[in-house]
Regions:
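Intrinsically disordered, compositionally biased terminal peptides
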Residues: 1-48, 52-55
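Soluble non-cytosolic domains of exported or imported proteins
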Residues: 85-96, 158-163, 167, 279-287
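Non-catalytic terminal regions of proteins
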Residues: 115-122, 145, 161-166, 173, ...
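Active-site scaffold of zinc-dependent metalloenzymes
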Residues: 123-169, 173, 178
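Metalloprotease/metallohydrolase-associated module, dominated by Zn2+-dependent proteases
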Residues: 189-321
Length: 321
């Protein structure tokens, strides 16, 4: 009887240990992370055919910054002509690059910052050639394919390509958030952000700020504005009404209690001390994407600035992953 009881007890403990040690995300370990390259017509359909799209959000300065006439037809023609074919060699190079990015990330962590099927497009002559996203597609400029990855060998000890990998993770996060726009609202609230409607902003902020807010495809179509700690509204706005590029931008902090008053966001010591970043910090979506790219660098032991990972904001992010 005692022997039987001991065997039962031993069996119970074995089952308990197995239960406690199996990762709840074990089913995600077998995910294969692939890359696909939509054809040009598919990209055009997602980017320019639907009038309830990117261009619906354009203001006069958004068109001016892109050197486009303010009409849907001109927007459509400009963006359609920017999309380029990706040849087989370029696809092979990007495939190898992405495979190396995936393999750098510990197996159990990959699902936290990657998506199963990455869609990539190539473009030239729009958005200042900055990487960006539309729908479920990440857009990279032709220089990425024709220069950065033209003779791809390895990520190892290549700072430029590691920077590209970090950018890729940033853009992937925009895709993930677009698929589930409210998935990080609890985190944003913990960071001190509270969502405010565009209608409220239009009624409250002076026109010389509202008319200069810069559109960003990565935050669309579910763009929301946010106030931080009931004291400031971070915004990216055009530096003047006489701009010639989307880079003619300043990042400001609008006083929540006095909307006619603003300072540069980098001069908001409380904000900067809390997040510890000076780029991509004008919107919680951008902070989130930047933190994911920093998390990638931490996971792959490439991180040099350790101050960020010590912040409360970054630690709160990691708890959500």
């Amino acid at each position: 009887m005692n022997t039987y009881f001991l065997f039962v007890l031993l069996g119970f403990f074995i089952v308990l240990v197995i239960y406690l040690t199996i990762d709840p995300n074990i089913e995600k370990f077998g995910i294969e992370y692939s890359v696909s390259y939509p054809n040009i017509e598919e990209i055009k359909n997602k980017l320019t055919v639907n009038k309830n799209s990117y261009f619906e959000f354009f203001k006069l300065l958004d068109a001016q910054a892109r050197n486009i006439k303010f009409s849907f037809k001109d927007f459509q023609e400009k963006y359609n002509s920017s999309i380029l074919e990706i040849d087989q060699k370029e696809k092979n190079n990007f495939d190898r690059f992405y495979k190396d990015v995936v393999n750098m990330i510990p197996l159990k962590k990959r699902h936290q910052i990657l998506i199963p099927n990455l869609k990539i497009a190539k473009f030239s002559g729009i958005e200042n050639d900055y990487p960006h996203t539309h729908s479920d597609i990440i857009f990279f400029s032709k220089s990425v394919f024709e220069n950065d990855l033209s003779n791809y060998q390895s990520l190892e000890n290549n700072k430029n390509l590691l920077s590209l990998a970090k950018t890729l993770i940033h853009e992937i996060n925009h895709i993930k958030l677009r698929q589930n726009p409210t998935m990080y609202d609890t985190l944003f609230n913990q960071w001190g952000f509270k969502s405010i409607s565009p209608q409220y902003l239009n009624q409250t902020l002076p026109n010389n700020i509202i008319s200069r807010i810069r559109i960003n495809p990565d935050e669309l179509p579910d763009y929301r504005f946010w106030v931080w700690r009931n004291k400031s509204i971070p915004l990216a706005i055009y530096s003047s009404t006489d701009i010639t590029s989307i880079s003619d931008t300043i990042i400001i902090s609008v006083d929540w209690n006095n909307p006619k008053k603003y300072t540069y966001l980098d001069d908001d010591d409380d904000f900067i001390d809390y997040f510890k970043i000076h780029v991509n910090h004008y919107h919680p979506n951008e902070i989130l994407a930047e933190y994911h790219s920093i998390y990638f660098m931490e996971l792959t032991k490439q991180l040099t600035d350790t101050d960020i990972i010590k912040t409360e904001a970054y630690k709160l992010l990691k708890k959500t992953l």
